[in-house]
Every structure is written in structure tokens, then in C-alpha cells.
């Protein structure tokens, strides 16, 4: 199910990548996905993050992630219960961030 805190963490990272011109799981401040979800108030036992850039439609990004073993594993992990999504539009296409997790 959608979780607002995970969505906030995902959006923060999508905006950070766009505003600071990079594409990486590590934020411009050195943060990782676990730090970002905790800063958003999420008490995580499990957290994983998928990022993508340039895919114009959601169907394309989901297909891309499902065809990538690591991204697919994040999305289908049996203990994952919640997700959040952040999308921001850049001049060369959108930045996509999916954060999945389970609270303790």
C-alpha cells in the first residue's frame, strides 16, 4: 500500500537529482535511501530503492524495472508491505524514484 512517508522520501530524492544534476542512489548530501526514509519519519526494518531517468511513461519504467533482476527483486521482495513514488520532470525527461519498505 502507498505510504506517505516513503513517498516524501522518494520525492525528496527525485528533486535532489534534478536540482543538482546527478543520477545516483546516494544523495547530494551523501544520504542513502535508509537515511532519507528515516528523515521522513519512517521507522524501517526493510527499505529498498529503484531509480530511473528519462522514461516518458510509467508503463515503460515498470517494464524496465521488472526486466532488471535487482530492481525486480526490490519490487517483489516478500516482506515489502509499503511503497512511495517520487517523479519530477527534467528538461531531458522525468526522474523516477520508487522506495519500498516495511516498518518495524
Language-model-detected regions and their locations in the chain:
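Short, surface-exposed glycine/acidic/tryptophan-bearing loops
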Residues: 4-57, 75
Amino acid at each position: 500500500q502507498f505510504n506517505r512517508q516513503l513517498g516524501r522520501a522518494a520525492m525528496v530524492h527525485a528533486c535532489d537529482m534534478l536540482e543538482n544534476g546527478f543520477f545516483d542512489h546516494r544523495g547530494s548530501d551523501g544520504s542513502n535511501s535508509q537515511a532519507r526514509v528515516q528523515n521522513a519519519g519512517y521507522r524501517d526494518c526493510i527499505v529498498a530503492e529503484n531509480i530511473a531517468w528519462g522514461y516518458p511513461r510509467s508503463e515503460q519504467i515498470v517494464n524496465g524495472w521488472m526486466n532488471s533482476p535487482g530492481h525486480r527483486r526490490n519490487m517483489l521482495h516478500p516482506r515489502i508491505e509499503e511503497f512511495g513514488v517520487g517523479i519530477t520532470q527534467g528538461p531531458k525527461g522525468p526522474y523516477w524514484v520508487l522506495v519500498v519498505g516495511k516498518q518495524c
